[in-house]
Amino acid sequence: MTNHGDFAHPSLLNAMTDIASQAAAAIMRVRENGAVARLKTDSSPVTEADEAAEAIILEGLARILPGIGVVSEEAAAQTETFQVPDPFILVDPLDGTREFIEGRDEFTVNIAIIQNGRPISGIVGAPALGTIWRGAMASGSERLHLPAGVAAKDAKDRSPLHTSAHRGGAWRAMVSRSHLDPATEAWLTRFSAIERMDCGSSVKFCRIAEGKADVYPRLGRTSEWDIAAGDAVLSAAGGLVLTPEGEPVRYGQVARNLKVPSFVAWCGAADAAKYSTV
């Protein structure tokens, strides 16, 4: 559908959005029928919704981007070694499986294209919220009101996304509902006052991209497919996703088995520069 240098083309972003929307519809069908969870070898939960969504996404990506390598969470669970080309695609078919199982609405479909170690475009779809956030470094980010299964061309509402710098007072801090750890709690003490906003999945990145939050620290290990799409949306909206040392998170790191030791998502460069190394 496109050459490697054209990953931000609107037609490709729409095609990726349609794939995410189709996967969202499959997830919602499983939710309506009652999801049954089981544990993977790493003790994390998986459901038939994860697998149904992944099958739709992989088939769709093979159709619109033939020959581009894909690393997807459920397929990756079957291997201990990775071969990552450049460019490649990172997929989490159902981010926030715990939230999904518990009946919450904060679970997402994540798709990101990675080139030269950074996400250049990404889709975060929240099936239960009827929302898709998408971003490309060449064109910016936007939020679409898009119920599961609806094509991008039929979106009823589109809003451009721009982060907002911290405006003083309490820091609006997104924190993980399922993975909050003591190291993250300690990191947050650098701010004199915080307004905690508990949330699951990649929705946390998107709230910062919308200007509704200021920072999201995660000092525990996570996988690249968990955060790449959120990074794409936030970075294209004016934010940053950095290591605690202030460097951009790099993707395709096979020496770490595609794990990210820790990161902090920021609303803007000035705030990151001021507080990253406090």
Regions found by a protein language model. Name each.
Residues M1-D18, A186-R190, K204-V278:
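Oxyanion/phosphate-interacting regions
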Residues I111-C206, V254-V278:
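Acidic beta-strand-loop-alpha-helix segment within the catalytic core
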Residues M1-L94, P182, A186-T189, E247, ...:
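N-terminal subdomain of lithium-sensitive/metallo-dependent phosphomonoesterases centered on the IMPase/IPPase/PAP
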Residues E51, A55, E74, P93-G96, ...:
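Generic detector of well-ordered alpha-helical packing
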Residues P85-V124:
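Glycine-rich active-site/cofactor-binding loop and its immediate structural neighborhood
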Residues I68, D86-F88, I120, I194, ...:
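Conserved acidic residues
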